[in-house]
Curated annotation (Swiss-Prot):
Taxonomic source organism: Grammostola rosea
Presence of the UniProt keyword Secreted in the record: yes
This protein's record includes keyword Disulfide bond: yes
A GO MF label: toxin activity
Highest classification ranks of the organism: Eukaryota, Metazoa, Ecdysozoa, Arthropoda, Chelicerata
Protein name: Kappa-theraphotoxin-Gr2b
Tissues in which the UniProt entry reports expression: Expressed by the venom gland.
Subcellular compartments: Secreted
GO CC aspect terms: extracellular region
Pfam families noted in UniProt: Toxin_12 (PF07740)
Domain characteristics, as noted in the entry: The presence of a 'disulfide through disulfide knot' structurally defines this protein as a knottin.
Keywords annotated in UniProt: Disulfide bond, Ion channel impairing toxin, Knottin, Neurotoxin, Potassium channel impairing toxin, Secreted, Toxin
SUPFAM superfamilies, A to Z: omega toxin-like
Length: 32
């Protein structure tokens, strides 16, 4: 379960809203 304010980024659940969060998510995915 994800809240909108949570910056969670994984394959099963994504709670990213806005450019900053999406960039953060992309960085976290690339880092593995």
């Amino acid at each position: 379960y994800c809240q909108k304010w949570m910056w969670t980024c994984d394959e099963e659940r994504k709670c990213c809203e806005g450019l900053v969060c999406r960039l953060w998510c992309k960085k976290k995915i690339e880092e593995g």
